[in-house]
Amino acid sequence: MSLTYMNMFMAFTISLLGLLMYRSHMMSSLLCLEGMMLSLFVMMTITILNTHLTLASMLPIILLVFAACEAALGLSLLVMVSTTYGMDYVQNLNLLQC
């Protein structure tokens, strides 16, 4: 396992641990999810470049599209919760009535 893969795996693991430890605040959870998506993007890109898979070269772009959609939905939910309740606790998500 090369040093780059190990660094990206450690970044993914640290982001996952951060998501598990700081799950009470929504902003912390969103930042940890973005860190996980970034490390997945870099690992996928490096793997595709090292194996010369030209057919799979679109996969990192698709992952970035899903990451952008996740970030937009997460931030809109964060704004809605923080303006309604004045705080960004995840426990307030159960109180939302649409």
Curated annotation (Swiss-Prot):
Record-annotated membrane-spanning stretches: 1-21, 29-49, 61-81
InterPro entries named in the record: NADH_UbQ_OxRdtase_chain4L/K, NUOK/Mnh_C1-like
The protein's name: NADH-ubiquinone oxidoreductase chain 4L
Annotated compartments: Mitochondrion inner membrane
Gene3D superfamilies from the UniProt entry: 1.10.287.3510
Main subcellular location: mitochondrion
Catalytic activity as recorded in UniProt: a ubiquinone + NADH + 5 H(+)(in) = a ubiquinol + NAD(+) + 4 H(+)(out)
Membrane topology annotation: Multi-pass membrane protein
Pfam families membership: Oxidored_q2
